[in-house]
Amino acid sequence: MNPSASRTRRQASRRAEVNTAALWVALAAMLPAGGFAAQDFSPAEQAIFMADQLANVKPPSTLRYTFRKAGSLEGGFDDTVVLSLRAQPDGSCCASSGEFLSGPRRLALPDVDNARANPVILYFLEHDIREMHRLTQGPENYFRKRIRMTVYQGATVTPGSFRYLGKPVAGREVSFQPYLADPNRYRYEKLAGKEYRFLLSDAVPGGVLGIRTRVAAASADAPPLLTEELMIEGATP
């Protein structure tokens, strides 16, 4: 292969990765100040995409998360996610950059200026969308829209009690299944029951304790077909 052509393809691929991740950032930036009232957004949208989750972070700070994939569908792995937060020019929080997984699994990420909601949510979702595309060959934007539509009108928000660094913390759990009622689910039936759970708490640095996805096996007594879990490990200056 021509080295120049190969380099051009790699550059184009990286631009595409950054642009698709930026789509989530743009969607999440739809704040009331942009002409929408808070009542135009569902409680789940406000909790996931619009809450000032970084309000309890003093920059500079690094948030570290563990990531685990498991299940009978294919091989699993353990990896890490790191979010670096820096002060804005006016000293407020935060400008952010991230490292989502490592090696060949690494997700190219855009830096986020003036972040208020925790970008790790958007990064996790973009990773998830890529995986749905890889496993089903379905269009990434289709899955992206299904998630956003379900967060708007089909998600459940409930109070929750979690543990962080060995201590109980109060928070909220947002759960939804974006593909369950999809008329096109027959195209990816094996993964159509996928469930998403967001564990959120103001007592945790960055407001996100964890994110979990789960696809149950066809048999109730069989282990899950696929699980992915991101959990906060801690924060350091």
Regions found by a protein language model. Name each.
Residues A38-V112, T136-P237:
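Acidic, serine/threonine-rich low-complexity disordered tracts
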Residues M1-A16:
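N-terminal secretory signal peptides that target proteins for export/translocation
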Residues R106-E131:
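Surface-exposed, glycine/proline- and aromatic-rich loop segments on solvent-exposed faces
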Residues A21-P32:
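Bacterial N-terminal signal peptides
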Residues M1, V18-N19, Q39, D78, ...:
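Intrinsic-disorder/low-complexity regions
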